[in-house]
């Protein structure tokens, strides 16, 4: 029996060989007496010729073959005539003369053509995901995903890490996003939660003495979705004992250097740049800045603190900021109507408006110019390095609104003006995060990362007296404006964990109820430990040049957390609900 060969791997060295091929019919062309088929398998395409001079029977069978039929071909590899060479195909210099063909399975006419360029809606593609996955671009994406995970595994295995599995059915905790809950049949009225991350288990693994753990972990979060979020996702989960934050960052960036070289053949320089959180916010208005282009925020609060333009001076008086973007040389590119569109854009981020000025040779012109003194104009010109033709866009508001709106506007303009080199990969560590965030509505602090993150040692004494100023021993890895993931050195002493829970507003009873197992473990010689978790789906999205996370997940959910292919979520039977001691409220759906 002949060994099957892969269609896309045939080349001129195979000319004259008899081959066995199996795959799908990409395209069929009947030229009257001759039939041509593009045969597709996971390796690519090859043209197969059915010619009565080689086999009448094969030609007769081919007359009944249609797109996406699964077929088996026996034939001979031959060189194409010079005039029929197809430079757009990897196998375009050869073809296979069929001596026999067998139809292994027929196919209905697909709801869309199986090719990379398709204008079919994403909903249709997701409903027929098994057909969508046949497209070459998705095949390439999932090969890249496999290569990436293999590269990561090989690196960590060589560094003496153990790949270990943590529970999927676990305990619901109050911090973070909403949990997906799983009702217990054995314990009526009680619920498991699907893990948002293996955070506590990997810390317990360190307390178990393994020292180096990793997992390609499935995680679940019941949160509002967007282009770079999914309810179930995969993260590269890593935890170590006895390493400092610098050592963990060094190890992680060497791992990413290996991935970039092996998967993309790109060399990245180490060490990766680092930037404190506050600097990232001040310069880019973002804690995950895209550093592939400049266009940084320019702060002018001190210059306009006493301005006659009350929007500016009142923002400063109220403890806010005034900052601007200088769009170099683009004043003539933006009409009032265009600027109005930009104003509507920043309002999405709670900005009240967008003030603007245009620079000519001698002055700044615009609706707010008459309210600014000569000293203020001179100060703005100097601070923003204003030149003829520049467009200045200001936001004056609460500090977080200024950062959010100008940070988002910066990215919008970067894309609109073609300032971003899409071929570049810019990594960045963001460090010195705030340990806590204050929620004015609830009147309490929340952990900026999670409640198990340790403070930088020199800030520990301020945890109860000035919690807002305490910095976390935490670090996020950013690539091209996307957070790949983050990590921290964990709290390993019970007294500090108790103190952290107290600052977060937990009573002793609440802390014991939710995290008693962790507090107990901390009393039995927990080692200093820390780690990191990187989003695998997001890494693949960026390496594959995808704009949508769904294209990196085999069977993703829609923006409404639905699976259009299987129709999940779905109702269940009354018997199933009764077994789980669950009764639906009136008006809720079931089967």
Curated annotation (Swiss-Prot):
Amino-acid positions noted as binding L-aspartate in the UniProt annotation, renumbered to this chain: 175, 221, 449, 490
GO biological process: aspartyl-tRNA aminoacylation
Enzyme class: ligase
Subcellular location as annotated: Cytoplasm
Binding site for ATP: 221-223, 230, 483, 535-538
Pfam families from the UniProt entry: GAD, tRNA-synt_2, tRNA_anti-codon
This protein's UniProt keywords: Aminoacyl-tRNA synthetase, ATP-binding, Cytoplasm, Ligase, Nucleotide-binding, Protein biosynthesis
Family annotation (InterPro entries): Aa-tRNA-synt_II, aa-tRNA-synth_II, aa-tRNA-synth_II/BPL/LPL, Asp-tRNA-ligase_1, Asp-tRNA-ligase_1_N, Asp/Asn-tRNA-synth_IIb, AspRS_core, GAD-like_sf
EC number: 6.1.1.12
Gene3D superfamilies according to UniProt: Bira Bifunctional Protein, Domain 2 (3.30.930.10), GAD-like domain (3.30.1360.30), Nucleic acid-binding proteins (2.40.50.140)
One GO MF term: catalytic activity, acting on a protein
CDD domains: AspRS_core (cd00777), EcAspRS_like_N (cd04317)
Family: Belongs to the class-II aminoacyl-tRNA synthetase family. Type 1 subfamily.
Binding partners and assembly: Homodimer.
Gene name in the database record: aspS
Region span, Aspartate: 199-202
Reaction equation(s) it catalyzes: tRNA(Asp) + L-aspartate + ATP = L-aspartyl-tRNA(Asp) + AMP + diphosphate
Protein name: Aspartate--tRNA ligase
Protein purpose: Catalyzes the attachment of L-aspartate to tRNA(Asp) in a two-step reaction: L-aspartate is first activated by ATP to form Asp-AMP and then transferred to the acceptor end of tRNA(Asp).
Gene Ontology terms: cellular component: cytoplasm
Chief location of this protein within or outside the cell: cytoplasm
């Amino acid at each position: 029996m002949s060994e099957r060969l892969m269609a896309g791997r045939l080349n001129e060295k195979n000319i004259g060989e008899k081959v066995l091929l199996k795959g799908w019919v990409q395209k069929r062309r009947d030229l009257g007496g001759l039939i041509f088929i593009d045969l597709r398998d996971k390796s690519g395409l090859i043209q197969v010729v059915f010619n009565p001079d080689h086999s009448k029977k094969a030609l007769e069978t081919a007359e009944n073959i249609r797109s996406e039929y699964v077929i088996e071909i026996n034939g001979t590899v031959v060189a194409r005539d010079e005039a029929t060479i197809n430079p757009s195909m990897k196998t375009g210099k050869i073809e296979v003369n069929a001596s026999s063909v067998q139809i292994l399975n027929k196919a209905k006419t697909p709801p869309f053509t199986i090719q990379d360029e398709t204008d079919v809606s994403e909903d249709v593609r997701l409903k027929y995901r098994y057909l969508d996955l046949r497209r070459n671009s998705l095949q390439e994406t999932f090969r890249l995903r496999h290569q990436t995970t293999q590269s990561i595994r090989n690196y960590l295995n060589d560094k003496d890490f153990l790949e270990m599995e943590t529970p999927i059915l676990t305990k619901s905790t109050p911090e973070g996003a909403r949990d997906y809950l799983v009702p217990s049949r054995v314990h009526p009225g009680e619920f498991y939660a699907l893990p948002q991350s293996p955070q506590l288990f990997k810390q317990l693994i360190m307390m178990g003495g393994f020292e180096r753990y990793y997992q390609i972990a499935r995680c679940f979060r019941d949160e509002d979705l967007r282009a770079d979020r999914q309810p179930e996702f995969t993260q590269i989960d890593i935890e170590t004992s006895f390493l400092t934050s610098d050592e963990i960052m060094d190890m992680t960036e060497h791992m990413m250097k290996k991935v970039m070289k092996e998967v993309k053949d790109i060399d990245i320089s180490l060490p990766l740049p680092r930037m404190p959180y506050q600097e990232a916010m001040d310069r880019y208005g973002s804690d995950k800045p895209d550093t592939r282009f400049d266009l940084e925020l320019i702060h002018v609060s001190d210059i306009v603190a006493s301005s006659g333009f009350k929007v500016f001076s009142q923002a400063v008086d109220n403890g806010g900021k005034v900052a601007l973007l200088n769009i170099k040389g683009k004043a003539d590119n933006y009409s009032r109507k265009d600027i109005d569109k930009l104003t509507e854009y920043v309002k999405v981020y709670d900005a009240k408006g967008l003030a603007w000025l245009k620079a000519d040779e001698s002055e700044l012109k615009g609706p707010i110019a008459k309210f600014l003194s000569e000293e203020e104009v001179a100060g703005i010109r100097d601070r923003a390095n204003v030149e003829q033709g520049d467009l200045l866009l200001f936001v004056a508001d609460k500090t977080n609104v200024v950062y959010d709106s100008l940070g988002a506007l910066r990215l919008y303009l970067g894309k609109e003006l073609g300032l971003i080199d899409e071929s570049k990969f810019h990594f960045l560590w963001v460090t010195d995060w705030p340990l806590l965030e204050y929620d004015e509505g609830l009147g309490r602090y929340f952990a900026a990362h999670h409640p198990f993150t340790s403070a930088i040692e020199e800030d520990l004494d301020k945890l109860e007296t000035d919690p807002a100023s305490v910095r976390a021993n935490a670090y996020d890895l950013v690539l091209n404006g996307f957070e790949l993931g983050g990590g921290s050195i964990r709290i390993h002493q019970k007294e500090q964990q108790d103190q952290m829970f107290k600052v977060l507003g937990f009573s002793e009873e609440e802390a014991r109820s939710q995290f008693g197992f962790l507090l107990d473990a901390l009393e039995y010689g927990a080692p200093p430990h820390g780690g990191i978790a990187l989003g695998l789906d997001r890494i693949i999205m960026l390496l594959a040049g995808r704009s949508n996370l769904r294209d990196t997940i085999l069977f993703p959910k829609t923006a409404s957390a639905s699976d259009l292919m299987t129709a999940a979520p779905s109702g269940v039977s009354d018997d199933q609900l009764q077994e789980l001691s669950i009764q639906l409220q009136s008006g809720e759906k079931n089967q």
